[in-house]
Amino acid sequence: MNDKGLLFIDEASGLSVDDIKDLSSTRSSGAVTMNKIIKGEARARTRLVWLSNPRSGRNVAEFYWKGFGAFQEYIPVVEDQARYDLVLTAAREDLDVLDGIDSTSMPQTAMWRALFSAAWNLTADQIKFSSDFKATMREVAHKLNDDYGGGPLVVGVAVHEKLLRLSCAMAVLCGDVYDGNLQVTSKHLDWAQQWLRYTLEKPSLSYGAYIREKRRAEQKKQENINWIKAQLELHPALKSLLTASSFKGYQITEILGIDRADASKLLSELLGRGLVKTGRSSSYIPDKLLLDVARQEEVNLNV
């Protein structure tokens, strides 16, 4: 089953979500199971390269989060998204003009084949790391997680694995093989993290922008939770409104026992924070976050 081989999957947009789940299982376990006339299992420790257009046929630029949005559409399960070492986009806006490409001559592939073959046949004990590599890796991995953690492409406990592979690739490209051993240094690690950052910040992928917006939304959510708790402590009767399916504006005055000016100010704050929305017949509908916090506070009081 192509054990320890390289596998390219082209036109992968034709695969169903279930097909991708099966391949992800193979990727994590290193084994493939066949259920036909008889059941069989074989080792399938492959390095996978996926090539695909967006599943829906839309251009990358049409997705709100550009290439990452297309990736989410193609691989909807977050756990499966995290299995990919690299997610690269090839969009029209990435390269308008081929600069420095001579279309009249064939590329010299023999040198690259030899380099690829040499790298592929390296064993684990032939890869040596400099004495400062481990400490530098810890710092670089922490910084990457600080900048891009919280999403599937940079996971704090596993990002060092991506950096290790990329660092080895950088060492191979530099030809840093001495006495039959690949010498990987902090210099290669620095280039690896720079390149990984470049791919994440690439406008056509938009992962960096996605993470920053995700963190902003999470911070706003926490601020809203703290504000709701403070209001419930100040006005315990507010819980009866927040746990209702809807309420009228005048009920704030009646239930909380506050004047119309204070009620209007409270309602305006709820609307401004996106915690209620307008409904039919001048009613207001609480956001799910309001319901969750109010119910949790009730549970805490009853404990």
Predicted regions and their residues:
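P-loop NTPase nucleotide-binding/switch module
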Residues: M1
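Walker B catalytic acidic pair
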Residues: K4, D10-A12, D22
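Residues immediately C-terminal
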Residues: G14-L15, D22, S56, A169
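Activation segment
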Residues: S16-V17, R58-N59, L256, A294
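Phosphate-sensing "switch" segment of ASCE/P-loop ATPases
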Residues: M34-P236
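Terminal-proximal interaction/regulatory segments of ATP-powered molecular machines
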Residues: A158, C174-T185, P203-V303
